[in-house]
Structure formats: C-alpha cells, structure tokens
Amino acid sequence: MGESTSLKEILSTLTKRILLIMIVTAAATAAGGLISFFALTPIYENSTQILVNQSKNERKEVQFNDVQTNLQLINTYNVIIKSPAILDEVIKEMGLSMTSQELNDKITVSSEQDSQVVNISVRDENAETAAHIANTIASVFQDKITSIMNVDNVSILSKAEVSEHPSPVSPKPLLNIAIAFAAGLAGSIGLAFLLEHLDNTIKSEEQLESLLDIPVLGTVSTIANEQKTAKTLQGFQSEKTGSGHFGA
C-alpha cells in the first residue's frame, strides 16, 4: 500500500511539474547543440605509421630473435618519439610556435600487441597541420634514431594524408546533445522533486490524514469573495429589518 502511494505521489509530482521539466530539458538540449556547433573548436586527427623491422644487413632471412628484439624496442621507441630530442627538432624544422611539451600533448603513440608497426597520431585544429606534424615526426625520428641508439631498423610504412573533406574527431555534436538532453532531464526531475519537497502546503485530504494520522470528518468549501460579500450584506439587511419590526 505504501509503495502504491509513493508511486502515486511521484507520478503526481511529475505531472504537476511537467511544464518545468519540458522547459529545462529543452533549454539544456538546445544549449548543448549550440555549444557543440558554434562554441567548440573542431579538432582533427591524422596518423602516420612506422615499421620497426630487422636491422639492415646482408642476411635476407628474418630471424626470430630479431623480431623479438624489435618488439622489445618498440616501448622504448614510443618514449623517444615524444621526447624533446625529437620534438624540438620537429618544432625547429616546421617553425612551430609552441614548446615541446605543448607539442607532446597533441601526440599519441601506440602499437598493437606483438606488432612491429607504430602509429603516430597528431591532433590539431587544422587537418593539414596535423598531417604535416605526424609526417615530420616520423621523418625526424627515422633520421635521429640511428645516432640515438646506433640502430637502423625504422622505416616509414605510410604517411598521413588529408582527405578532401576531413571530419573532426571532436567535438561530437550528436553525443553532446544526447548528454545534454539526459542531464537536462535528470536535473529538471530533480528540481521538480526539490520544489515539491520545499512546498509544505497541504493540498488534499489524503495529505492531511497522512500528516496528522487522524481521519478527516469533513471539508469546508471555498466561498468566493463576491458571494461572501453578498451573503454578508443580505444578512445585515435582514437583521436591520428585524430590528425595526421589533421596535415597532
């Protein structure tokens, strides 16, 4: 019985505040869309791939130990690619107006497990700049690794290219709108229940019975002011007339 009453109160609150819920949800959804399309700067991503292969020598066959060694080196290479030794040279070569740390924040270096392929991904507000940075990093790394580690086992597998109509990786307007809708709906429902909780006026017999734990014997209807005034004047005139007859 308590559960049904509670559910009834919940539905009653939602119904009573439905306009508030709709307005807040719509406003949040619209704000999410406007921010996604007009306020946030699009970010583009481009990637290049390098291959860590066996050392270049006169042997044509690939030894298992060579592959294992290259796989172990990949983690080291991932760190070196994002080090100032490489990034400072990239900044100098491209004439970028940023620090090596700022450039580092734009770069993601990854590789699949047991794969000799390393992916270098760069994010930037300009798709062409992202591609240029990725390709320059790969080129500089290929040149520098021979002197840094005295090895020559890196080759560029594929270069970053810019499509005719590049798509930004962020923001994602549809996702942002969906999140804004969900947040607006949840927030508006929470606000509705908060307002209902702060409203301590008694609006029904059921509320009064629940609050005082006593039965309601009857109710007094609300009398309109005009009717109340008319009845008051009518009663006053009747009393006056009665008083006059009594005096006679």
Curated annotation (Swiss-Prot):
Chain segments annotated as transmembrane: 18-38, 174-194
Record localization: Cell membrane
Listed GO MF terms: protein tyrosine kinase activity
Membrane protein topology class: Multi-pass membrane protein
UniProt superkingdom: Bacteria
Pfam families, per database record: GNVR, Wzz
PTM characteristics: Not phosphorylated in vitro by YwqD.
Gene Ontology biological process: capsule polysaccharide biosynthetic process
Pathway: Capsule biogenesis; capsule polysaccharide biosynthesis
Keywords from the UniProt entry: Capsule biogenesis/degradation, Cell membrane, Exopolysaccharide synthesis, Membrane, Transmembrane, Transmembrane helix
GO CC annotations on file: plasma membrane
UniProt family annotation: Belongs to the CpsC/CapA family.
Reported function: Required for YwqD kinase activity. May bring YwqD and its substrates into contact. Probably involved in the regulation of capsular polysaccharide biosynthesis.
Name assigned to this protein: Probable capsular polysaccharide biosynthesis protein YwqC
The organism of origin for this protein: Bacillus subtilis (strain 168)
Gene: ywqC
